[in-house]
Amino acid sequence: MVHLSAEEKGHINAIWSKVSVDQTGAEALGRLLIVYPWTSRFFDHFGDLSSAKGVMGNAKVQGHGAKVLTSFGDAVKNMDNLKGTFAKLSELHCDKLHVDPENFRLLGNILVICLAEHFGKDFTPEVQAAWQKLVAGVATALAHKYH
């Protein structure tokens, strides 16, 4: 699994404490659906996702994005036990939803992009590296049930 130093954990917590879960979650999920449109097949019940404007203005995308990022907050709280933290979600996404585990990596990378955009100069290369490690760890934990 991922080992994060005390300094890296500090970088992650400093940014996370300023994150708007609703806004950033909606933005990250919306960008995923726009940039990787095949991911929308998991969200057929969300209505029209055929345009960027439709995706970003979709209340269900916004709500689920907030839910996803709230869950990601569990990773921030449990950085030393990502596998255990996401065991049930891994099982759900593997056994019931059949989500391609690559999608977890894609969403994690988009989250890092959103954070970089929101935090600008505070999102230094060191901060980005710490976040990349965390999102990679979360993606691995979510994909655990697939192995």
Curated annotation (Swiss-Prot):
CC per GO annotation: blood microparticle; haptoglobin-hemoglobin complex; hemoglobin complex
InterPro entries: Globin, Globin-like_sf, Globin/Proto, Hemoglobin_b, Hemoglobin_oxygen_transport
One GO molecular-function entry: haptoglobin binding
Expression sites by tissue: Red blood cells.
Domain Globin: 3-147
Keywords on record: Acetylation, Heme, Iron, Metal-binding, Oxygen transport, S-nitrosylation, Transport
Top-rank taxon, per record: Eukaryota
List of residues that carry N-acetylvaline: 2
Binding site for heme b: 64, 93
One BP term from GO: hydrogen peroxide catabolic process
Modification type N6-acetyllysine: residues: 60, 83, 145
Cysteine disulfide partners in this protein: none
S-nitrosocysteine: residues carrying this PTM: 94
Complex and partners: Heterotetramer of two alpha chains and two beta chains.
Family listed: Belongs to the globin family.
Task performed by this protein: Involved in oxygen transport from the lung to the various peripheral tissues.
Protein name: Hemoglobin subunit beta
